Amino acid sequence: HGEGAWDYLSRNERDASHFDSLMKGLSEKGGAERSLVALGASDAAFAWSELPQRSRVIDVGGGEGHLLAQILKNHPHFVGTCVDLSDVAARASAYLSNVAGAEAVAGSFFEQLPAGDVYVLKWILHDWDDDDALRILQAVRKSMTADA
């Protein structure tokens, strides 16, 4: 189409909706207990239970916020922010509206991100060449709290 995938999806709501459904389906494949979302939010994948109360989780490029929602449901003493492009963040805001402690904000992972204690990058870095992946990680590092 002569344009990047994200630009195309930002202008084509129907295709963006299909893409969101695909990503949700991939995350939830395997059922409620074996899905990537369930595993990613569990202590089997990361020592979530060892984090301090009120830790702030930043889901970078988090789409509609499915993983963040599960993390906050499993660990209600956390708060979290899903960061994605503006059109996606609007959908995430709607999805997360009933999840305590959750919010969605528009942003780019190449720029300043919200301050947080833990950063989640699910299915992000593999989409980019090494230079861009490094830029994403540098943006995360600049945004981290002192104890992150």
Task: Identify the meaning behind each predicted range.
Residues 1-148:
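Conserved adenosyl
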